[in-house]
Amino acid sequence: MKPHLTFFCQLETPVLQALFSVPDIAYLGELNASVSLGILDLSQERAEVVKRLNEAGVPVIAWLLLPKEQGHWFSLENADLAFDRYQNFLAWTETNGLQWAGIGLDIEPDVSFIEEFHRLSVSRSRILMKILRQVFDRRRLTRARKVYRDLILRMKADGYKVDTYQFPFIVDERKSSSTLLQRAVGMVDLPVDREVLMTFSSYLRPYGPGFIWSYGQDGASIGIGSTGGGVDLGVLETRPLTWKELSRDLRLAWVY
């Protein structure tokens, strides 16, 4: 059985337009592949790219994101902003007549938290105290989980399938019936139609392939490679995979 491929794309609008301006866009249809498109903005230019993919018969998943100053990814910190972002997305979709195969929620720690953690050597006590406060604040997780679950129900009522893009460590939380990691770093475990585990081996060289072997069997889908674009925090190596590395990861992912 052939795997179903979904290409993640998180590019700023000018580069995005250039990428999808070539005739080769039809090749995505021949592959029966989908595109999960990062919604970095709600511009007319980005809408035109979506329309081009719609016309080519390529299924497009709306990968919802927030502005960097609001955390960029969805987490416990910005749950209240998720509904507003979705409402604005719906208005943009209706105005431009866009078609979506589903909606993706990227669940990761807040950008500011990652930046603080990266500066651990100069603000160690501050970040550790913040983590401790978050670990003991169980109500924060309960409240955010309810907000996101209500949002997911709304999305489904609107006719959308919902994906989450999760760090694989959420699997360990689930197996151990724990919420420690979620409370500590702001992740949240959510019931959705499809969970994609982000096993990006490019961030874990040279041990990346083991990441896929360890968690591949636990995900409905597996994310490999590196999405590029988006927010570059300078925390991890983001050099793209070579073709040899990518083909290796594709073969490993195919096993599951």
Feature-to-residue mapping (PLM):
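The substrate-binding groove and active-site-proximal loops of carbohydrate-active enzymes
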Residues: L11-T13, N32-L40, Q70-A82, Q134-T142, ...
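Substrate-binding cleft of secreted/luminal carbohydrate-active enzymes
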Residues: P3-L5, V192-G210, S214, D218-Y256
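Aromatic-lined carbohydrate-recognition surfaces of secreted/lumenal glycan-active proteins
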Residues: P3-E12, I61, L132-L181, V196-F200, ...
